[in-house]
């Protein structure tokens, strides 16, 4: 019999993290009724025994994706989730989207890869060819670099479609969920009482607005990924790399309308070069 991933969480741990607090009763989705314990003071209380059961049922599927040598994509762009998502993905050597989800990140990867090529070219110019650039050009390039990196750093080295997408709050990340479902990619999600669980393959009912709740559950998933990789002898490689590129905000260059126009022209130049 195959060894099951460890899940050392208890109902008490989940309760202390506030994972049981759902939304106000007037904001619920009836399809979440299965996971609700009771109504109290105008709030729905999530059945944490079911949360624990669902998590323990989902973890073997997470580990199965790792064993099949498929990447995992963490998605959480709302304020409470983004730092947790990014940290967990980096520690586990997986991929993430913690800022804005760009339409087509999964379903139109050709366009996304062109943007990544643009990012690569800008980094090369800033790190290797900067002696040929004016201070103004460097500042404009650095600004363009920051914009691209902010949205793309977590998927920059994602070479194939993920085997699993892990989402915090599918109602907030509905475009990501829709793209995953269109491609037949399973979705594991932290789902609150206001969400529709129907499109989710692995539902983890919990408070998806609490930082403590999100961190506790995502950390448990992350630990299972790391443990599985160690048992398989798989190297954990960070999905991001750090370059010594000066922040454009630190440069003594004032943004004018002409600067913005030049930035737009610069962006078009790089984009057209990659298209060719």
Curated annotation (Swiss-Prot):
CDD domains per the UniProt record, alphabetical? RPS2
Matching Pfam families = Ribosomal_S2
**What is the residue range of the signal peptide feature?**
none
Q: What is this protein called?
A: Small ribosomal subunit protein uS2
Q: Which family does it belong to?
A: Belongs to the universal ribosomal protein uS2 family.
Record Gene3D superfamilies: Glucose-6-phosphate isomerase like protein, domain 1, Helix hairpin bin
User: Does the keyword Cell cycle belong to this entry?
Assistant: no
Q: Name one GO cellular component term.
A: cytosolic small ribosomal subunit
């Amino acid at each position: 019999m195959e060894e099951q991933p460890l899940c050392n969480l208890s109902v008490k741990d989940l309760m202390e993290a506030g994972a049981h607090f759902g939304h106000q009763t007037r904001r619920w989705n009836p399809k979440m009724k299965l996971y609700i314990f009771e109504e109290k003071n105008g709030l729905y209380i999530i059945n944490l025994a079911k949360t624990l059961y669902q998590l323990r049922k989902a973890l073997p599927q997470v580990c199965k994706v790792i064993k099949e040598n498929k990447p995992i994509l963490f998605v959480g762009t709302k304020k409470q989730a983004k730092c947790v998502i990014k940290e967990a993905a980096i520690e586990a050597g997986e991929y993430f989207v913690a800022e804005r989800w760009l339409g087509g990140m999964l379903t139109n990867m050709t366009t996304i890869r062109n943007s990544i090529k643009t990012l690569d070219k800008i980094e090369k110019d800033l790190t290797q060819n900067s002696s040929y650039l004016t201070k103004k050009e460097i500042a404009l390039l650095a600004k363009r670099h920051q914009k691209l990196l902010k949205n793309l750093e977590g998927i920059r080295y994602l070479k194939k479609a993920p085997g699993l997408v892990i989402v915090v709050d599918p109602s907030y990340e509905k475009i990501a969920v829709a793209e995953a479902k269109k491609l037949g990619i399973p979705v594991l999600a932290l789902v609150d009482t206001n969400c529709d669980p129907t499109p989710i393959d692995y539902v983890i009912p919990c408070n998806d607005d609490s930082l403590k709740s999100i961190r506790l559950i995502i950390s448990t998933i992350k630990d299972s990924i790391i443990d599985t990789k160690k048992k398989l002898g798989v190297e954990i490689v960070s999905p991001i790399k750090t370059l010594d590129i000066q922040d454009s905000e630190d440069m003594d260059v004032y943004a004018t309308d002409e600067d913005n126009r030049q930035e737009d022209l610069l962006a078009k130049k790089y984009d057209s070069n990659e298209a060719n």
